[in-house]
């Protein structure tokens, strides 16, 4: 019977190609809009390191101005970064399995013998545990050790993109580069690694900046007396005339993350932070109420509002648009089926059951759904390509955004799109198919 119903559907399409094409276009536009917004929303709202969500924690302490909160919109939250003195002290704790402090620096990178002109590169100054703690994948070599942190050692890890630029993707471990006037030996090259959102530093680009081009031990920042190029907050009227005064100031510019695999280690780390807070309060700092936090990745993304209200509104609008398209499709299907009511009445008079009439029209709806799904996937791909083109300015250059990387089509997305298209269209076609199946045949036979 299915093949017979398909033949009837094919004849129906040929009789009304305009209406059929209109329904397919309506479904395709609605599905395409949903694909684009759902894909981007899923990317920005996802947890890029979900498997370690309950063991990785951002460390925050409220050393801010006692007369006002760090964020007037969220007065209960401490600053998202730490001061230099607080970060370096907390790094002395042996409680975490892994711990890392970090900031963003601007570096000038060139070849060791002048064979490459200096180019600006965004650099992550961090500590050795950054790589194992965040499961950063290496293509060649690896990260540095604790001794290089203390030195600091003249070692560097390159990103996949930067290694492609400088060495054509070849194994560059052991090569030497000049970074900010100092020679650095490459000890590792990353695989392509673009966590979205960039959870470990949400202060730049709302968490959607690309990862850095190079990574060096954190202590190179104070050794070279280099100011951070990333986000920095300060308060008060303190005068800062040199680098030593800067690192001793109440300026917040360092992110800190710890890996705490057990509830006991989390409690111990928080107790360590509270004890330090009490000591500093006696010394005249931390005059605000105690507000120390260990925040896991998922909660960190929420409190920093990574998914903006605009994204949620766009998602709702896209589904509303799909609903409008489906309502229009229902109207067209109903008009089309009712126009053939005389034929349907004749079939009923000849012995066709309501169920058979229902399934005949539902198969026709399913064929339209399949065509609409296919066209919707095409529209969705075109839409995602448009988003990539819109945000692909400087995507692989200094300071580039990672928004374009979010708009990618994956097999799971295709499966969801096809399922969404088929189910929504068939659901929309149930009412017209049910209506035509319940029409009394005598009424239409008498009119002929």
Which residues does each predicted region cover?
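Membrane-helix entry/capping segments
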Residues: 1-4, 11, 15, 19, ...
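Intracellular coupling helices
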Residues: 6-18, 327-368, 438-439, 443-447
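Generic structural signal for small/hydrophobic residues in well-ordered secondary structure
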Residues: 13-16, 35, 44, 58-61, ...
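Short, strongly hydrophobic transmembrane alpha-helices
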Residues: 16-50
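Alpha-helical transmembrane segments of integral membrane proteins
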Residues: 19-33, 315-331, 364-376, 413-417, ...
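Structured, solvent-exposed hinge/loop segments at the ends of secondary-structure elements
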Residues: 38-166, 170, 179-184, 195, ...
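Mid-to-C-terminal secondary-structure elements
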Residues: 128-143, 154-304
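Small-residue-rich transmembrane alpha-helices
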Residues: 366-438
């Amino acid at each position: 019977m299915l093949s017979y119903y398909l033949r009837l559907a094919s004849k129906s399409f040929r009789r009304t190609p305009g209406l059929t094409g209109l329904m397919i276009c309506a479904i395709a536009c609605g599905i395409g809009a949903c694909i684009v917004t759902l894909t981007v929303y899923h990317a920005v709202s996802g947890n890029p390191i979900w498997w370690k969500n309950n063991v990785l924690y951002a460390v925050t302490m409220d050393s801010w101005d006692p007369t006002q909160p760090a964020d007037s919109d969220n007065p209960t939250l401490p600053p998202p970064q730490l001061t230099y003195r607080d970060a370096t002290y907390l790094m002395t704790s042996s409680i975490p399995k892994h711990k890392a402090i970090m900031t963003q620096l601007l570096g000038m990178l060139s070849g060791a013998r002048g064979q490459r002109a200096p180019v600006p590169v965004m650099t992550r100054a961090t500590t050795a545990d950054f790589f194992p703690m965040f499961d950063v994948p290496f293509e060649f070599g690896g990260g540095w050790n604790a001794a290089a942190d203390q030195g600091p050692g003249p070692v560097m890890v390159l990103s996949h993109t930067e290694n492609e630029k400088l060495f054509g993707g070849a194994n560059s471990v052991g090569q030497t580069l000049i970074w900010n006037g100092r020679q650095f030996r490459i000890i590792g090259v990353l695989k392509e690694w673009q966590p979205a959102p960039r959870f470990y530093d949400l202060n730049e680009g709302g968490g959607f900046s690309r990862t850095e081009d190079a990574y060096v031990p954190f202590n190179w920042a104070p050794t070279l007396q280099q100011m951070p190029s990333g986000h920095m907050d300060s308060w008060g009227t303190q005068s800062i005339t040199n680098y030593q005064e800067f690192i001793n100031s109440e300026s917040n510019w360092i992110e800190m993350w710890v890996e705490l695999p057990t509830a006991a280690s989390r409690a111990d780390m928080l107790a360590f932070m509270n004890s330090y807070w009490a000591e500093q309060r006696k010394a005249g700092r931390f005059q605000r109420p105690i507000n120390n936090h260990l925040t896991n990745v998922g909660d960190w993304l929420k409190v920093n509002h990574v998914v903006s209200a605009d994204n949620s509104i766009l998602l709702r609008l896209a589904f509303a648009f799909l609903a409008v398209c489906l309502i229009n499709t229902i109207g067209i299907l109903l008009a089309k089926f009712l126009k053939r009511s005389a034929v349907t009445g004749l079939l009923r008079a000849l012995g066709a059951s309501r169920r058979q009439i229902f399934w005949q029209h539902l198969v026709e709806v399913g064929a339209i759904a399949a065509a609409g799904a296919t066209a919707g996937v095409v529209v969705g791909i075109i839409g995602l390509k448009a988003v990539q083109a819109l945000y692909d300015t400087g995507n692989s250059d200094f300071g580039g955004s990672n928004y374009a990387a979010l708009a990618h089509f994956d097999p799971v997305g295709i499966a969801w799109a096809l399922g969404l298209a088929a189910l929504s269209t068939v659901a929309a076609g149930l009412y017209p198919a049910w209506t035509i199946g319940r029409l009394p045949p005598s009424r239409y036979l008498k009119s002929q």
